[in-house]
Amino acid sequence: MSAADKKPLIPPSHITIKIKSQDDICVYFRIKRDVELRTMMQAYSDKVGQQMSAFRFHCDGIRIKPNQTPNELDLEDGDEIDAFVDQIAGFSHRH
């Protein structure tokens, strides 16, 4: 096969991302690489019945901002995002 016959490797325009909760509940989303993750974050929040502001989303230990895209984060098909519930109040122990 000549070099002219080889097609360049073009990544697919969509990828599947798994969002995993602290309770090990997984929700899968198919998203475009160049669309802000805000859409997926909002859809996840709606699916679990919480406001988006109640969650922190992380990938490989790095917090994800809603305006970032999969391309900016180098996300690949099958990658996992962790969804953590923000703690609203602390605990105070008084004697």
From Swiss-Prot:
**UniProt keywords, alphabetically:** Cytoplasm, Isopeptide bond, Nucleus, Ubl conjugation pathway
Q: Which cysteines are joined by disulfide bonds?
A: none
Q: Where does it live in the cell?
A: Nucleus; Cytoplasm
Q: Record's InterPro entries?
A: Rad60/SUMO-like_dom, Ubiquitin-like_dom, Ubiquitin-like_domsf
Taking every annotated instance into account, which residue ranges of this chain make up the domain Ubiquitin-like?
13-90
- Quote the cellular component terms of the Gene Ontology held in the record: cytoplasm; nucleus
Cross-link Glycyl lysine isopeptide (Gly-Lys) (interchain with K-? in acceptor proteins) residue location(s): 90
Family stated for the protein in its record? Belongs to the ubiquitin family. SUMO subfamily.
Remarks, anything else? Stress conditions rapidly and substantially elevates the amount of SUMO1 and SUMO2 conjugates with a concomitant reduction in the amount of free SUMO proteins. The SUMO conjugation system plays an important function in stress protection and/or repair.
Q: How does it assemble?
A: Interacts with SAE2, SCE1, SIZ1 and MMS21 Covalently attached to a number of proteins.
Q: What does this protein do?
A: Ubiquitin-like protein which can be covalently attached to target lysines as a monomer. Does not seem to be involved in protein degradation and may function as an antagonist of ubiquitin in the degradation process.
* The name this protein goes by in its record: Putative small ubiquitin-related modifier 7
Question: What organism does this protein naturally occur in?
Answer: Arabidopsis thaliana
